[in-house]
C-alpha cells in the first residue's frame, strides 16, 4: 500500500494498515506531530483550556493575525491518534517498525513514481512542531494559573531514514494507493467580492463586510481552534452576540 499524506488521516491509516500486517509505504508531507498527552493532560484538554483563555482575552491559541504567512492557514493539523484511548504517532518510530517512508509525491510516469527531496527536513519539522509552537503556550498557561502537573516525561527517539527518489510500484508490489492529502473549499456559489487571493472569506472573526453575511468553522477564522470542536463553539457564541 502507498499512503500519500501525513496529516492525521494518512498517519492513522498507515498505522492501522501496518498493524494489520500490510506492507506500507508512506509519502511524508510538511506536517507536524504532537503528543497525545503532555504533562499528564490530554492534548484536547490543553486545546480547550487555551481556547477559553483566548476567548477571555488572555494568551491562548495563536490568532490568525499572528501567522507569519497567510499560507499557514492551510497547514494540516499535527498528527496523533485517538485509537485505544489515544497515543502518540512518531514517523521515525513508524520507520523503525517497518513502514517505509518516502518524500512528498512529486510526479508519476506509468508505474514509476517520483518523490521530492527533503524527507529529512519534513521529519525534522514534524519533530520540532510541538516544542516550537504549542509547548510554550502550555507552559505559559501553567505559569499563569499555577497548575500542579507532573513533569514532561517524553523521551527523544532518534532514527535515520534514507532518502528515496523514485519507486516502481509494480516491482514493490503496491496494489493500492490511498490519497490522504486533504481537501479544499469552494465558495464559488457566493457571488460577492469578499474573498482573498487564496479563496478565504475576508471577515472580522467571521463577520463579513456584507450586512447579514457571516461565516463559521473556516480555517483560522479567529485562531487555531476555529475549524475544530474546541474553538468553533466560542466563535459561534461571538457571532450570535453580533446579531
Task: Give residue spans per PLM region.
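Flavin (primarily FAD) cofactor-binding/catalytic cores of flavoenzymes
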Residues: 1-243
Amino acid at each position: 500500500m502507498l499512503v500519500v499524506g501525513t496529516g492525521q488521516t494518512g498517519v492513522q491509516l498507515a498505522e492501522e494498515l501496518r498493524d494489520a500486517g500490510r506492507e506500507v509505504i508512506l509519502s511524508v508531507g510538511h506536517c507536524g506531530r504532537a503528543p497525545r498527552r503532555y504533562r499528564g493532560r490530554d492534548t484536547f484538554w490543553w486545546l480547550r483550556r487555551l481556547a477559553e483563555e483566548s476567548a477571555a482575552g488572555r494568551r491562548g491559541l495563536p490568532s490568525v493575525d499572528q501567522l507569519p504567512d497567510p499560507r499557514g492557514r492551510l497547514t494540516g493539523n499535527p498528527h496523533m491518534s485517538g485509537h485505544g484511548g489515544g497515543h502518540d504517532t512518531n514517523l521515525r518510530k513508524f520507520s523503525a517498525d517497518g513502514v517505509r517512508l518516502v518524500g512528498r509525491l512529486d510526479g508519476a510516469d506509468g508505474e514509476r513514481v517520483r518523490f521530492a527531496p527533503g524527507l529529512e527536513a519534513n521529519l525534522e519539522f514534524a519533530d520540532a512542531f510541538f516544542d516550537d509552537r504549542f509547548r510554550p503556550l502550555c507552559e505559559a498557561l501553567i505559569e499563569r494559573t499555577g497548575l500542579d502537573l507532573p513533569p514532561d516525561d517524553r523521551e527523544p527517539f532518534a532514527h535515520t531514514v534514507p532518502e528515496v527518489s523514485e519507486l516502481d510500484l509494480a516491482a514493490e508490489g503496491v496494489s493500492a494507493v490511498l490519497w490522504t492529502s486533504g481537501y479544499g473549499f469552494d465558495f464559488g456559489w457566493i457571488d460577492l467580492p469578499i474573498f482573498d487571493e487564496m479563496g478565504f472569506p475576508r471577515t472580522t472573526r467571521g463577520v463579513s463586510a456584507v450586512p447579514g453575511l457571516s461565516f463559521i468553522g473556516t480555517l483560522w477564522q479567529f485562531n487555531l481552534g476555529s475549524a475544530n470542536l474546541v474553538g468553533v463553539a466560542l466563535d459561534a457564541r461571538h457571532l450570535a452576540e453580533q446579531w
